[in-house]
Design a protein with these regions (language model features):
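Conserved N-terminal entry element of GNAT/NAT acetyltransferase domains
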Residues: 1-12, 161-163
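Acetyl-CoA-dependent GNAT
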Residues: 12-89, 100-111, 158-162
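Conserved hydrophobic/aromatic "anchor" residues
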Residues: 35, 58, 130, 136, ...
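Conserved glycine-rich acetyl-CoA-binding loop
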Residues: 83-101, 110, 115, 121-129, ...
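C-terminal "cap" of GNAT-fold acetyltransferases
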Residues: 114-117, 121-125, 134, 144-163
Length: 163
């Protein structure tokens, strides 16, 4: 894919496109306020992926203070992946990987996060494989996490350079 892929920070004018991709790809949908609020608070970890100038995917994260998902009772800042989606025709081309890596880099560099974590449907094998390939490990399960009652794996990774 290479040179025609551009990962950049979300801008307000991207909102309609990102909401459309979210509706197209995921059953978990959000109000426009939710997107704008996350962008206002954590602009460096709300990213879009452009292919030939058109947005085909996004990632948005929330920066949280809490405890390590990988070590007991270790307080730290966490990068929580709230939502990531890539349009079906553009999947399996490294776009999700590029979004994840850039969001984790920015989380570390801009907000001082030590770990990244996310929830993923237990049946979403392609996503689980992607996260495992990136180095995420399953650290727990949330029962009936999704509105339809499906469980979620909680997966986490230490972001490089953790002191």
């Amino acid at each position: 894919l290479g040179s025609d892929l551009n990962i950049r920070c979300f801008r307000a004018e991207d909102l309609d496109r990102v909401m459309t991709i979210n509706l197209e790809c995921l059953p978990e949908n959000y109000s426009s306020y939710f997107y704008i609020d996350l962008h206002r608070r954590f602009p460096k970890t709300f990213l879009v992926a452009e292919v030939e100038g058109e947005i085909q995917g996004y990632i948005m994260c929330r920066i949280e203070r809490g405890f390590s998902k990988l070590h007991t009772f270790r307080p730290m800042k966490l990068c929580h992946v709230v939502s990531i989606a890539v349009r079906e025709p553009y999947r399996r081309r490294g776009i999700g990987t590029a979004l994840m890596l850039e969001a984790m880099r920015n989380g570390r560099k801009e907000y001082g996060t030590g770990e990244c974590y996310l929830e993923v449907r237990v049946t979403n094998e392609p996503a689980i494989r992607l996260y495992e390939k990136l180095g995420f490990v399953k650290v727990g399960k949330r029962r009936s996490y999704y509105l339809d009652g499906e469980d979620a794996w909680i997966m986490a990774i230490a972001i490089n350079g953790v002191k």
